[in-house]
Amino acid sequence: IFVCLGTAIACADADNPVQTTLFQKALTEPGLPIVVSGESVTDLEKQCRVDQERVNWLLDTQNTGYIIPAGQHLAVTRAHQTFRDQHDKKDAEGDFACAWLDHGTAPRDRSYHYAVIPNADAAELGRSAHEWQNSAPYRVVRQDAAAHAVLTVRPAERLTAAFFAPATLDGAGPLPSVTVSKPCLVIVEKRDSGLVLSVTDPDLRLDSNYVSQPGEIVVTLAGNWQISNGTQTGAVRREDDPAATEIALTCRDGMPVRVSLVWNIGGKN
């Protein structure tokens, strides 16, 4: 499952709507269907009507599934389109199936949320959409300009977060609160013996010769943790407050750095 989140969508254009495209698929065969919340659609020049007050789901022509939570302006069409070819800029045309979320004209602080399920099956997708209305396998724990974070509850408890600035993410379920010193990507996964922390710095820090340089990111976890035996990466720093653990990680080349942590029973590093 890929969870897609967007926030702080804004535009001053009052004439043209701002849209988030879910898919735009060429209809290479006549009657190639898409499925819209259980309805198989094959007609051309058709705009599908969807109930915005409920969870909707889509299956595109390549069996990619989409589940869209309620309260969003979803539009789905099958139509003939004309466009400019990207190679020679000549006029071109074709039949396409398209789906998008409409944020309206001149939007301010709009957002979106949907999930993508590759290699999906219509029957299974329909069951999932129905079940997710009451019991989704994940929940969004933060969605704002500072961070996007999702807690996966099935099959494993895992917190996945994209931090756009230094910020603190409150504890989610059995997982501790997380504070980061710089923008980064963080995964915290619960294991029987403790936690696995993964951190990625998307900033390559290229020098004048376009060579990636290392950078340090400090992650603070609530609780008294220590790096488990056999883990070579990371350095634990103890704050004055024993209720928190700082872990300094050196990241480079956009690659993840992974650290295994166990509860520090003795209270010393």
Task: Please provide the spans of the model-predicted regions.
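Terminal accessory/anchoring regions of large secretory-pathway or extracellular enzymes
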Residues: I1-N269
